[in-house]
Design a protein with these regions (language model features):
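Beta-propeller domains
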Residues: 1-114, 147, 155-157
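Terminal, non-catalytic domain-edge segments
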Residues: 92, 259-270
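Intrinsically disordered, low-complexity acidic/polar segments
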Residues: 36-37, 53, 107, 170-171, ...
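Flexible, surface-exposed loop regions and adjacent strand-edge segments
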Residues: 114-118, 179
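Beta-propeller blade signature
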Residues: 39-53, 117-132, 144-169, 215-223, ...
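Short beta-strand elements that form the blades of beta-propeller/WD-repeat-like
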Residues: 22-35, 45, 87, 94-106, ...
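Conserved blade-ending motifs and adjacent loop-strand segments that build the rim/top face
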Residues: 2-16, 54-86, 170-192, 221-250
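C-terminal structural cap/anchor segments
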Residues: 126, 130-145, 163-206, 210
């Protein structure tokens, strides 16, 4: 067992990624200066598997430029408070891309609070996994927190993409702008990632003229965001569930969808 010196800072939801190419363990988390405070930035630690010791540890504060870019609304100071780490993509040289999404809920029963969301509200059992973790989507379903799906509205907004070197220092940042919400469940919200042509393609639903269109925005290695034409279904009535999608080859991704209460699968080729 090993301990990490957090220098009197607070972190939540540590994400562990195994780098088999470089024999490293990569640890990432958002951090705070005080308990229940605002998210200040990103904590990154790199542990070497061969020597069994810490190689680097950094607390990287997020400046006003990143906060202004990431926020949906509200002051810059609290801009990152609703962001959760979703993906970490490793590169051969040990650097990586970290992807976080703006997520929160609204309910008549309880107010939203990041700390309560992660570690449990006194009136809700911490063993209720759907409440405890923002990543427990279930199998094509997610029950409401309060046994009443209609009382919960889910919000999935901007996606923050951070390019970082092999010690966790920030090199560049980009944002995919989106606004998504739904009542009762979040099966059709969030995004999928498709790596094709040296770019990260983000696929997500967006409501346009009462029709859910599967949008495609791509991010290049330099951080440039390109808005591509929507992937319009040839047949009406199909609603995609991109969060459950799976890339199956260098040019193909399988996306589950719903059609007249049936689950089916669409194959998208690049």
């Amino acid at each position: 067992m090993h301990s990490l010196d957090l220098k009197e800072k607070f972190i939540d939801e540590m994400k562990l990624k195994v780098d088999n190419v470089n024999d490293h363990y990569l640890i990432n988390s958002f951090y705070y200066e005080r308990k229940r405070g605002n998210v200040e930035g990103l904590y990154t630690a790199v542990w070497d598997a061969k020597s069994d010791q810490l190689i680097s540890q950094n607390f990287v504060p997020m400046g006003d430029s990143v906060r202004s870019l990431a926020k949906t609304d509200g002051p810059d100071r609290s801009a990152l408070n609703d962001f959760f780490i979703r993906d970490v993509i490793l590169k051969k040289d040990g650097s990586f891309i970290l992807i976080a999404e703006d997520y929160y809920t609204q309910s008549r029963a309880l107010p939203w609070n990041r700390y309560d969301y992660l570690y449990g509200y006194p009136s809700i059992s911490p063993y209720y996994y759907n409440y405890y973790s923002p990543y427990s989507y279930g199998y094509y379903g997610r029950p409401g927190y309060y046994n009443n799906n209609n009382s919960v509205r889910y919000y999935y907004n901007n996606v923050l993409i951070l390019n970082q070197d092999n010690t966790g220092q920030l090199e560049s940042g980009s944002v995919i702008r989106k606004t998504q919400f739904d009542d009762g469940d979040d099966n059709f919200l969030s995004y999928a990632i498709m790596l094709a042509g040296g770019q990260l393609h983000f696929l997500f639903n967006e409501l346009e003229r009462r029709t859910q269109l599967l949008n495609d925005q791509s991010v290049s290695g330099s951080g440039k965001v390109t808005r591509n034409p929507p992937l319009k279904s040839l047949d009406k009535g199909y609603i995609f569930m991109p969060r459950y999608a799976k890339q199956v080859s260098a040019s193909e991704i399988i996306v589950p969808c719903i059609y007249r209460n049936y689950v089916c699968f669409a194959k998208i080729e690049y």
